Amino acid sequence: MSHSVKIYDTCIGCTHCVRACPTDVLEMIPWDGCKAKQIASAPRTEDCVGCKRCESACPTDFLSVRVYLGPETTRSMALSY
């Protein structure tokens, strides 16, 4: 799948998204831009299945982590309707 996972600087370093990901796409890395001194990172996007559990787990109302589904997923979702 070709999904894109973007982490934004509104991340508060809580690790909820990392713990919610069933395919271990996300990890925390050091970052001085927030109180927790860490930010989510997505080094393994090729393993993303597009479930968006990371988005649902994010306490910043989906403003910090976003999953953009690839074209093949969008097409298959349209066929299921």
From Swiss-Prot:
It comes from the Eukaryota. [4Fe-4S] cluster 1 binds at C11, C14, C17, C58. Its EC number is 1.97.1.12. It is found in: Plastid, Chloroplast thylakoid membrane. It catalyses: reduced [plastocyanin] + hnu + oxidized [2Fe-2S]-[ferredoxin] = oxidized [plastocyanin] + reduced [2Fe-2S]-[ferredoxin]. GO terms for cellular component: chloroplast thylakoid membrane; photosystem I. The keyword Ligase does not apply. InterPro entries: 4Fe4S_Fe-S-bd (IPR017896), 4Fe4S_Fe_S_CS (IPR017900), PSI_iron-sulfur_center (IPR050157), PSI_PsaC (IPR017491). Signal peptide: none annotated. Binds 2 [4Fe-4S] clusters. Cluster 2 is most probably the spectroscopically characterized electron acceptor FA and cluster 1 is most probably FB. Pfam families: Fer4_21. Keywords: 4Fe-4S, Chloroplast, Electron transport, Iron, Iron-sulfur, Membrane, Metal-binding, Oxidoreductase, Photosynthesis, Photosystem I, Plastid, Repeat, Thylakoid, Transport. GO terms for molecular function: 4 iron, 4 sulfur cluster binding; electron transfer activity; metal ion binding; oxidoreductase activity. [4Fe-4S] cluster 2 binds at C21, C48, C51, C54. Its cofactor is [4Fe-4S] cluster. Residues 2-31, 39-68 form the 4Fe-4S ferredoxin-type domain. Apoprotein for the two 4Fe-4S centers FA and FB of photosystem I (PSI); essential for photochemical activity. FB is the terminal electron acceptor of PSI, donating electrons to ferredoxin. The C-terminus interacts with PsaA/B/D and helps assemble the protein into the PSI complex. Required for binding of PsaD and PsaE to PSI. PSI is a plastocyanin-ferredoxin oxidoreductase, converting photonic excitation into a charge separation, which transfers an electron from the donor P700 chlorophyll pair to the spectroscopically characterized acceptors A0, A1, FX, FA and FB in turn. The eukaryotic PSI reaction center is composed of at least 11 subunits. This is Photosystem I iron-sulfur center. It comes from Zea mays. The lineage of its organism: Eukaryota, Viridiplantae, Streptophyta, Embryophyta, Tracheophyta. The gene is psaC.
